[in-house]
Amino acid sequence: MNNTHRYFTTPIYYASGEPHAGHLYSTALMNILERHYQHRGMATRTLTGLDEHGEKIEEKAKSVSKAPQQLVDELALKWKEIFGQFAFSYDIFMRTTSAEHKKNVTQILQRCFDKGDIYFGEHEGHYCVDCEAFLTGKEMDEKNHCLVHKRPTELRREGNYYFRVQKYLPQIIDLICKGEIVSQRRYINELAALAESFEGDLSISRPKTRTQWGIELPFDKNHVAYVWFDALLNYVTGIGGIDAAQTSPLWNSATHVIGRDILKFHGLFWPAILLSLGLKIPRLCVTGWLLSGGHKMSKSLGNVIAPADLLPLGRDAFVNTAFRLANPGEDVDLTIKTITERFNADLANGIGNLASRTLTMIEKYFEGVIPAFHIEQQIEDERLLADQASALPALVETAFDEFRLADALQQTWELIARTDKYIANQKPWELGKHGDDASRARLANVLAHSTAVLRNVGYLVAAFFPERMTELLLALGEDTNQMHNAYNKARDFYDIRKGYKLSVIPRLFQRIEVTSTSAAAALSSPVPSSKASGKTTNAMNTKAPEATPTSSAPTTTTEISIDDFSKVQIRIGTVINAELVEGSTKLLRLRVSLGELGLRQIFSGIREWITPEELVNRKVLIASNLAPRKMKFGVSEGMLLSAEGQNGKVLPVFVNEEMKEGSLLA
């Protein structure tokens, strides 16, 4: 595969209905791959679209009293509309009813026929209309029901044209075992087993007596092309046809993003056709099942997540969870609750909080001017931070080349976590209280290193979150018209825009809040909230929340029994994130880790006496078994214990850093 071009495709989706979350996953993956390789300086092309032929579509059109072309025209508009809502981009939206595609299919059919790779034969077997295929014994149950669609098959006998898969099968098995068709280990084994057990050849036509909705065979006017043969050829149509594909650098660096359920078609039949045509076989990026609540999404289970369920959360929330939880090829378990929690933890509390803290302190202590490094005063933690950040671009490149996108995100978030810990240890808010040159230089170094990490991360995850990372990079003074050079820029850790005056501090990712008990219950269910409650947009918002202080110093003493006291569980917590609450003069919003009890959102009325930066990564005491309290700005899930100091300030009770997170105060 060359280092100048990349051609990425999704499967062309079957035009039998509207998109679901699985379609969004594949399309998002194509977009992420495209942007990543663009940022490495490569020319790219992307293709998605609809597979619009076949008996199933013809039958559906009849059931709604429409012509097949009218039905697919309407669906194509709907698919484009939904893709637009998620800001998905593509160079080609392929439709198999287009004149260009029909011409390409006709030409390829004739070439394969003239070569002797297509012949006429008769077949009797069990046919699944939904699969649009004859099934083998392994693909049916004891009642001859399709294992995928759980419906009875039809016993059919008919004459069709066949493609000689067996002629190319030994060569295909060899390519599979060498990892040249798919490189993901689990799918090498799965595809090899499919190839070694495959018998016979591939039926590539259907008689017009059964269906007329297809591309007519050039050598027999009584047959139309089988929908799968027709559909696979769309990838060549996207290059400009068979002749263009012979010499195209895009075709020679093509990657098909496909679901594991269509592995046989893309990993066995498609290579056979390409070998017949003398074309290079693209590599496959196989995706796993999309689960919800531990089960494969299914209309019968009621756990399908529709685009309408995801829109209120936004594309970034969906993308972060889908590609943070598992690498492509592994199954991904999505619920609205998981998507919300991961967004808040990774984006709002992760890079969003790091950007807010760093840029706010630059504004406060350096009048908004990015400080220069003081390399001569660099400490060991800073050298290690710089080394980790400088090595990250190569690690992310390798991860992408191997379709390990979750690993790429994990390595990036490890850098963010290290930077958060570094800031907590260096306490820049304390350094800012001193006016001496040494403290000033240390403060400059802390903020310069934090800025460099933000710049590095901004370039490396722009493929996932393009709009927000563009905002971040622009805020840092970077030229986002040079994104084709992003990885080279990210390699130079120290190349920050020192002296650049911040014009804006972006709020990159605002937390997604659950604003009602019913919404919280809906989020915890694998069934989408819009299905459970009939309301999606009212269940969540991205705005913040007035309340009273979380605790205050007692003025009188009231005796209670030991039994009463034992009801209160006070635990050690670590403040992971702290931020000002917009619209409140009293509150801080805290994200506190209680170890095995997980993360809690807690509102504390101590904003007057302490800054968010002074709280992060500190060990505190939390009353952990209080009932969740609904406030104006959200739900508070505990109480931060505070007390009044000698100077009148109300401050948290900090505890020894050696105390175990989540442990119960005794």
Describe each region flagged by the PLM.
Residues 2-48, 100-104, 155-364, 408-412:
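Structured secondary-structure scaffolds
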Residues 115-169:
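Cys/His-rich short segments
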Residues 472-564:
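Intrinsic disorder at enzyme termini
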